[in-house]
Amino acid sequence: MTAKEMAMQTITMDAAKAHIGFLASDELRGRKAGTNDSKVAAQYIKSQLRQWGIAPLADKYEQPFSAYSMEWQKKKPYYVEPDSVAKLKGMTHRKLNMYNILGMIPGKKTDEYVIVGAHFDHVGYDPDLDGDQIYNGADDNASGVSAVLQIAKAFVESKTVPERNIIFAFWDGEELGLLGSKYFVQTCQFIDQVKGYLNFDMIGRNNKPENPAYMVYFYTAAHTAFGDWLKEDIQRYGLNLDPSYRAWDNPVGGSDNGSFAKKGIPIIWYHTDGHPDYHQPGDEACKINYEKTRDITRAAFLNVWNLANVESY
């Protein structure tokens, strides 16, 4: 068994249950961006990276940023773009302080990067609801965070130095308009040296109960190798996945992949489609398909291995 294959085996259902169980617990009250509950989630992520010896991207794991909205109304958009923020600061009614969490495993080529990411915020809680008031966000997106964490640990376990730097990114403010990933892309001094971005958003459920292995695999159409990789790995490693392959000419929508696609960076996005509990209190950890979450995470680990080590794609 190769180092890659042994590392893949460290990705387990038990680890997914532990990560999702904590992040989607009632104690975190839905991890709304800009709240102490979201900060607890960020501290948990940071503690995992530190425990595994994964260094921060910069001098610390947190990348702080602020977002501004013109009014207090819930539906008003938030802005992190420098030009927009400069115009809004004088008349803003609301400011949110948030931060991304960023870790990195250095590669041999210090001037090339790949990024694997997921947002850790959700939509909080509603004290006016009858019954369950907490939007736990197990699928959206504790499931995706668990995948990035397990992939980070698997690379450590591989004891292999990748060809390219691998950044493990946990975005804040996605539910308010991809704010964390937008800020990262706009301020990243090496953005033109990022060779690929892999995104997770909702990988633990699906809307096809008759086919629990169903998932959606979005990727930049010009990079046909991305589709080939998944097909080959499902067959080679017996992963119980039934992907709908979505080659996308301009993959700018849906999730944090859009922030990178707008810069022309090739993307892969794992997703298991919508369901009735989307942005509802019913998005609970007990409803996650942990076998599928594990197999998606293993498939994505193999993707990231290729992104970090294959010469061209």
Across the structure, where does each feature detected by a protein language model lie?
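Metal-dependent peptidase/peptidase-like ectodomains
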Residues: 171-272
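Second-shell loop/turn segments in exported
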Residues: 2-10, 26-36, 88-92, 129-141, ...
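A non-catalytic alpha/beta surface segment that caps or lines the substrate-entry region
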Residues: 31-104
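Acidic/His- and Gly-rich active-site-bordering loop/insert found
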Residues: 23, 49, 91-127
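N-terminal capping segment at the start of a domain
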Residues: 3-40, 51-62, 66, 276-283
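Structural recognition of the beta-strand scaffold that forms the well-ordered cores
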Residues: 19-24, 63, 100-104, 113-117, ...
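His/Asp/Glu-rich mid-to-C-terminal helical/loop segments that flank catalytic regions of hydrolases
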Residues: 274-313
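Alpha-helical metal-binding/catalytic segments enriched in His/Glu/Asp
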Residues: 101-103, 116-122, 126-177, 300
